[in-house]
Design a protein with these regions (language model features):
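Alpha-helical transmembrane segments of integral membrane proteins
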Residues: 10-17, 64-74, 97-108, 138, ...
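Interfacial loop at the N-terminal end of multi-pass membrane proteins
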Residues: 2-67
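Hydrophobic alpha-helical transmembrane segments
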Residues: 67-88
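Short, highly charged, low-complexity non-transmembrane loops/tails of multi-pass membrane proteins
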Residues: 169-186
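Alpha-helical transmembrane segments of multi-pass integral membrane proteins
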Residues: 109-173
Length: 186
């Protein structure tokens, strides 16, 4: 299956829909950041900062954060995986399976981070033992930098895929123009 992934057609509609969903989810994150006072726990990878933020959140902010994590943050990996995966498969064709590995790692670590974040928020809301919260926060602090590293790598691969698509389209247009000139001569 993996060796044939580059052969699956990636339609413009699907890519446009995935892009639109990503933009809507990013706007939702922006609104949530505003309601939470400027910082989302999803963006923090330092243990001390995570614990400090959890201590500063009011119960209302914890509930808003739980809603963001369950609603937006669980859908976002699916949306960007569709967008990035489609661009990579379309831009690199037969080479795409190897180039999709960072995306798969990214989605896995993002989902691990979301689950640990949800556990942190719920345990903080329930006023669980600080040692329990600290253990889960330490796990999140390990996972978040890996997630962002894979996000940067996957984004770079996606940009190269878009550049590849642009070059392919330019070559097709150049060949078409050349063929028309040859046709006029004969």
């Amino acid at each position: 299956m993996w060796k044939n992934i580059g052969r699956y057609p990636v339609h413009n509609r699907m890519l446009c829909a995935a892009f639109g969903v990503c933009m809507l989810l990013l706007y939702g994150f922006h609104l949530a950041r505003f309601r939470l006072g400027g910082v989302l726990l999803d963006e923090v990878g330092d243990l001390a900062t995570i614990l400090a933020l959890l201590g500063q959140f009011s119960p209302h902010q914890l509930w808003v954060h739980i809603g963001v994590t369950v609603g937006l943050d669980l859908l976002f990996p699916l949306a960007y995986a569709t967008l990035f995966g489609g661009l990579i498969a379309r831009g690199f064709g037969a080479y795409s399976p190897a180039l999709l590995v960072p995306l798969a790692v990214l989605v896995g670590f993002d989902l691990f981070e979301n689950l640990s974040q949800l556990a942190l928020l719920l345990l903080t809301l329930l006023q669980a033992a600080p040692a329990t919260i600290e253990i889960i926060a330490a796990f999140k602090a390990l996972v978040t930098p890996i997630k962002f590293s894979m996000l940067f790598l996957t984004s770079a691969i996606s940009v190269m895929a878009v550049m590849s698509l642009g070059i392919q389209q330019s070559l097709r247009l150049w060949d078409f123009g050349r063929a028309r000139k040859l046709q006029k001569r004969h």
